[in-house]
Amino acid sequence: MNTERDSETTFDEDSQPNDEVVPYSDDETEDELEDQGPAVEPEQNRVNREVEKKKETFRKDCTWQVKANDRKFHEQPHFMNTKFFCIKESKYASNAIKTYKYNALTFLPMNLFEQFKRAANFYFLILLILQAIPQISTLAWYTTLVPLLLVLGITAIKDLVDDVARHKMDKEINNRTCEVIKDGRFKIIKWKDIQVGDVIRLKKNDFIPADILLLSSSEPNSLCYVETAELDGETNLKFKMALEITDQYLQIEDNLATFDGFIECEEPNNRLDKFTGTLFWRNQSFPLDADKILLRGCVIRNTDVCHGLVIFAGADTKIMKNSGKTRFKRTKIDYLMNYMVYTIIIVLILVSAGLAIGHAYWEAQIGNYSWYLYDGENATPSYRGFLNFWGYIIVLNTMVPISLYVSVEVIRLGQSHFINWDLQMYYAEKDTPAKSRTTTLNEQLGQIHYIFSDKTGTLTQNIMTFKKCCINGTIYGDHRDASQHSHSKIELVDFSWNEFADGKLAFYDHYLIEQIQSGKEPEVRQFFFLLSICHTVMVDRIDGQINYQAASPDEGALVNAARNFGFAFLARTQNTITVSELGTERTYSVLAILDFNSDRKRMSIIVRTPEGSIRLYCKGADTVIYERLHRMNPMKQETQDALDIFASETLRTLCLCYKEIEEKEFAEWNKKFMAASVASSNRDEALDKVYEEIERDLILLGATAIEDKLQDGVPETISKLAKADIKIWVLTGDKKETAENIGFACELLTEDTTICYGEDINSLLHTRMENQRNRGGVSAKFAPPAYEPFFPPGENRALIITGSWLNEILLEKKTKRSKILKLKFPRTEEERRMRSQSRRRLEEKKEQRQKNFVDLACECSAVICCRVTPKQKAMVVDLVKRYKKAITLAIGDGANDVNMIKTAHIGVGISGQEGMQAVMSSDYSFAQFRYLQRLLLVHGRWSYIRMCKFLRYFFYKNFAFTLVHFWYSFFNGYSAQTAYEDWFITLYNVLYSSLPVLLMGLLDQDVSDKLSLRFPGLYVVGQRDLLFNYKKFFVSLLHGVLTSMVLFFIPFGAYLQTVGQDGEAPSDYQSFAVTMASALVITVNFQIGLDTSYWTFVNAFSIFGSIALYFGIMFDFHSAGIHVLFPSAFQFTGTASNALRQPYIWLTIILTVAVCLLPVVAIRFLSMTIWPSESDKIQKHRKRLKAEEQWKRRQSVFRRGASSRRSAYAFSHQRGYADLISSGRSIRKKRSPLDAIIADGTAEYRRTVES
């Protein structure tokens, strides 16, 4: 017990997590963690590790081998794989692609097989087989076959149309042509004939036919421009660069034909931005990475000619590897609907069994003694009851609706199109409409509890502007600082003295320009020189003007800033970079580029100056830079203070530093660097370790501050969503101060919000864990008997936590002991048992702590997680899904949000400045965060209401229809006879009752879109599952049961002793069936009229049209002419005309319909009068609200200002944002009752009208 207590997460001063440290990377290995500090290692573990290392030397990650211009090499036996028995195929795929599923021979069997894998279709297939057995079925075979064929046919036609389109596309692509070296010369061949190892030639605007290694280009410096829109949706051009040696020697046809390079690289995979390989040629090895690979699907742009070597073809290409099936998401209603169908099946079996027992008893007591019922078979009552069980399964099968799933898909498809067509979610500035990328999740948009949002590019614009900087401890950039430098100018700086200035940078500090031009402080010039040289930006000249292509908006903003301040990046080759320094062009030799990635959080470049000295320039996050600074950096504290100021103003920061490198030191390091660059295994890890050796003892120059403005409408959107009881969590990689101020800017945080940080959270969780342990909560894996809140009720709390604290609190932090204690050799049984118990206790404690954290966080009105990795973003989403069982939505715009978007129930992508990775992984996409309120509060709520109404009505109408057979069975000896005509049973769900409910599921709306946005509190019905749950389900079933009783017993009583006008009794079975069927069709169609809130001509036409269609078909099917053609199928000859000419029959139908519907009308009236819902109240005052809205639009609205919480807040220089930032309004204030809101608005409107 003591050991367990000690293992609880507590911290002393030295071990406390650092809020500024980005937690371990997703790819961090155990070996890297072990290097973080010394530890006592057991001898056996050391031996085991050495053995593993020896084995590791024989392992290679690069097992894919390619030989240029040698097709026979790839046909060797050891490259052949066994596919089926003795049939073998090459390891290397052909370049022909096949995306279609069927051909002329396989379509019918394969499509039917796929459709019958669905449980509902298979169920009805079994019913159809049972109906073919005469001893069982009392129903004609076509009653099941026609609806089943209709469902199968609709799906098959859709699949066929899709597959024919795929056939055409495959044929078009495979028959494209390309120039390939064959027999020493370039020849034109089709794409499908290209093979791995071929050397190909591509020209401007050509599509790239396979994944190829760029060998040479007609552009200077071996550059090749490609457009990657088909891969990632991005339309801006990318730059690829060939190896210098191949570009130099492989320009002409003869040299390309004799090229015999050999490549070892990674196996085919779906990582678009990763490639590891080595080219062996001329007794040398050259490292290959993704920058030298042209991917299939891209287009050559602005490059006349380029040559490449095919590495991956056809199905092995990265674009094809990414075309696999995505994880299928299902809605909460899907699961509930399936459970309800299972419930109906159980009810069906129980009812059929009960009626079968009744038939066996009836046979024993009555049937066996009734000579006129003898059928020639001497079966026992038990056997007849057994056969009757299956007969009732067939008769009552319509309790399980065959068309339910098809109807649901049609409704969802229509709702998705409504989202796509919504012009109010169209962003005209970028011509970007909203896009529903899935058709299966629409109603779940109306049930969201938690939104997890990225910050940069989602809440903000991700348009970076250089605003401030700190150089050598001095802050530049704010016009208010001018007085400190004896200047009073506040106008914009004039950059006309600089020929390379782009004229777009708005900067106010004239003193910085004086410092640059005078050269009094060399660090200032060095600062901007670093920005101009330390990057991976590519330059292009359009109409004589410099145009930069940057990997990220931040990098582009910094290089453009350097350009405006006189240090313009002009050109680069593989080995040089040219910069204009205050008008003087200088070229530097590039010795190495230590590239940026999300784990390193920095990039460096090593250059040789024209004078011959070697320097390393580095820029990166302050957390990683400060760890690598030389101890003698006098301006560390001043720069840190500046970083804090920048963060308080929500500016994004980077630190800049450099170091001088001795020639000998660089030579030794370069050997390691070159070795790591061509490593066959773990190349990235090897390079990172080499980078670490040189990136140390750095000299700090200063820091940059970039502004990223808030998007339009973000505060209003967050406020609306909060009023809808949706909690918003912001997950970002930014600094804590920046994230906190963004929280205030978008009104997630307000002046009356009490903020809890990592230390507070850890203390609260520690106390809760202790209390639970004392009650036996952890070991028993049970929560306390009653939930105990962490905070007093009524307090407005927010939680801000960093990634480091998140790992500590959730016990997710990896430790170096994890591998040391992992013994390779067998342990004793006692050791295994103790290890197992210890591991189980740790897992239990971890699970309990995570649950407590989620409970604590969910009590807060806002949660902001900063300095978090993509993996942590997904982990936080998963925790809320797991422990709160709540519906989650994740929204982001970048590749680092993809994991989070895929983890959430619904993923939304913002098509912004960071490419299209998030959009391509999302379920819905649009251009601005503010459209989220319309997606949820309008489309989501409508879709949820429509789907709930549809399902409730669907179950009701099927039970009302089917259970008439149940009541009829009490009067026919439980003999599984049907109460209706066979053709009516066949067409009821297909024609007579299908269209109105489909239109209700597509078009119905309780209130307008404007009122939905004005009263976000209406949204809670979906969150609380108020419109579709087991209670509503059973109410619908009960309604159907009662309706079926009325439909049967009123006509039954009316027919019992009746004589018509002609003196004949109309109480025959066929007239009785017509009367019940007519009453049923009128009842269910009028019932949907009562359920409809939004009437259109289409709704009315569908209801009355369905009734008219029923009577038209009935009179046709009961005519003598069709009976003559098909006497066995149409046996109700003349029934409709004979029965419906009797006024008594019409009186019976009207009475039946009235008794079915009038109680519903009465109950609805009482409910809306005595217990009105929020929606009912708004509908009641709809005209007043509309008038009030029109009046408000005519009035000028004035707001009183308020003092700003941050006096140095620099989020925007435009008028109007200060009110949003500093209004002090709480987004969690208690809402007024809806009646009071309406009453106040009405009173105000009346007073204005009267005045």
UniProtKB/Swiss-Prot annotation:
Stretches for region Disordered: 1-52
Topology, Extracellular side: 143-144, 361-385, 974-982, 1054-1071, 1116-1142
Keywords: ATP-binding, Cell membrane, Cell projection, Endoplasmic reticulum, Glycoprotein, Golgi apparatus, Magnesium, Membrane, Metal-binding, Nucleotide-binding, Translocase, Transmembrane, Transmembrane helix
Membrane topology: Multi-pass membrane protein
Pfam families assigned: Cation_ATPase, E1-E2_ATPase, PhoLip_ATPase_C, PhoLip_ATPase_N
Gene3D superfamilies according to UniProt: Calcium-transporting ATPase, cytoplasmic domain N, Calcium-transporting ATPase, cytoplasmic transduction domain A, HAD superfamily/HAD-like
Transmembrane domains' residue ranges: 122-142, 145-165, 340-360, 386-406, 953-973, 983-1003, 1033-1053, 1072-1092, 1095-1115, 1143-1163
Membrane side Cytoplasmic: residue ranges: 1-121, 166-339, 407-952, 1004-1032, 1093-1094, 1164-1251
Localization per Swiss-Prot or TrEMBL: Cell membrane; Apical cell membrane; Cell projection, Stereocilium; Endoplasmic reticulum
Name assigned to this protein: Phospholipid-transporting ATPase IC
Originating species: Rattus norvegicus (Rat)
Lineage, opening ranks: Eukaryota, Metazoa, Chordata, Craniata, Vertebrata
